[in-house]
Amino acid sequence: NNLLVSYINQTGEEVFLDGFWSESKSWFVEGKSSAVLSEENPTETLSYVLQIGEGFVQKDLTFSYDSYEVVINTNLRGIKNDVLDGNFRLDWVGGLPLTEPSQDGMFLEGLVGQGGDIESFKAGSAGLFGSSSGAIERSAKQYTGPADFVGYRTKYFGVFFVPQKTDFVEIAKYSSDKRIAVDVITNQNINFEETTLYLGPLEYGEISNLGVGIEEKILGWQWLSSVSWLVYSIMIFMYGLIPNYGIVVVLFAILIKTVTYPLMAKQLRSSKKMQEINPLLNN
């Protein structure tokens, strides 16, 4: 279970809500033990409760069809008298599996959005030819003040929290089971229960739907972002006409060659002229 809820009680002890969460109500319909999301059934909410003393904590997870977003509602009002300062923590623990261990370390990066700016925290330690979790020392970086999002990315995937409201976030990295692990932490008030969790590929359209600017980081270096955006836009347009990325890539390569041919032809002519006059220069 990567998703963890915790809080500080009135005696200053941290309480981790990692016990057995039971369903608050049965969502099974007509004896079915699962739900299938579709255009006819676009959302499904799973509700769980955990008893703490005489009170209850409720956690709702809302999944949407054709989306990598999960809306999390965490209700601690049933134990609010035990929660110090009315704040709780929502953590994503352990990070994501590495799809390419030899290269992912180069791309592991914690990201925090604050005031329209994106702060970066390098989580990996890798060279061009490999990565080593043993080289990772446990460290963390904390950010105070309102944050639009917090999370981290691998080469192809990302996990991000987009909280309703938070004044403190943290990213921690360490070695676990011979791989790099990353924890993402948000601190929230119990009156602001909703958090959006994005867990999926770094696909520009999906990321931009979050509306917090994460897509700016997946376009690469800033000086390349305009070119990356142009390439992305052209390929998406072509995919809309021909829904096959293999064919789109081939056609895009032909398009690039056609556009750059005049320049290449000019260079070839110049090179040929240099070869013709080279004997004269040597004489």
Segment roles from a protein language model:
Residues 259-283:
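Membrane-interface amphipathic helices and adjacent TM-edge segments
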Residues 188, 238, 257, 281:
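Conserved hydrophobic/aromatic pocket- or pore-lining residues that grip, position, or stack substrates
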